[in-house]
Amino acid sequence: MQNKKSYRPNVAAVILSSKYPEKCEFFVAHRTDIRNAWQFPQGGIDEGETPEDALYRELLEEIGCNNVEILGEFPEWITYDFPKTARGKVYPFDGQTQKYFLVRLKEEAQINLQAFEIPEFKEYTFVKYDELFQKVTYFKRKVYRRVIDHFIKEGLI
């Protein structure tokens, strides 16, 4: 008999800089715990929390700022498996099922990666669309492209 896979409910934020729409740049951050792993902010949904509530909480925890405007929400939950080398190391899950939001930093937003005791990220940058997929960790590229291309198709980016 095969074991059923388990997936962690999660939210993820595709963050556009406050310069959008004049300049289209995506926020990506370098994880503190994994070498060369760049990604979007994301995190688990706590019991009783809505995905939108989790989004605001996770942004505050991970980048020290939830001063954003929500521009869109991906219509589906996207599930992906962790790489085999990572499974079971941090969470007892095989992967994550994620709800993606497209957000824009407000003009007065201030990012502070040191806002919490144990920082999730050590540095961040803003990149253009064509640079994004070279920068982010390999196993997230397909999902990121699907989500961003959807937002582009919908006219949100």
From Swiss-Prot:
It comes from the Bacteria. A motif (Nudix box) lies at residues 43-64. The keyword RNA-binding does not apply. Residues 6-149 form the Nudix hydrolase domain. Keywords: Hydrolase. SUPFAM superfamilies: Nudix. GO terms for biological process: nucleoside phosphate metabolic process; ribose phosphate metabolic process. InterPro entries: Nudix_hydrolase, NUDIX_hydrolase-like_dom_sf, NUDIX_hydrolase_CS, NUDIX_hydrolase_dom, RppH. GO terms for molecular function: bis(5'-adenosyl)-pentaphosphatase activity; guanosine-3',5'-bis(diphosphate) 3'-diphosphatase activity. Its EC number is 3.6.1.-. Its cofactor is a divalent metal cation. The keyword Oxidoreductase does not apply. Accelerates the degradation of transcripts by removing pyrophosphate from the 5'-end of triphosphorylated RNA, leading to a more labile monophosphorylated state that can stimulate subsequent ribonuclease cleavage. Belongs to the Nudix hydrolase family. RppH subfamily. This is RNA pyrophosphohydrolase. It comes from Sulfurovum sp. (strain NBC37-1).
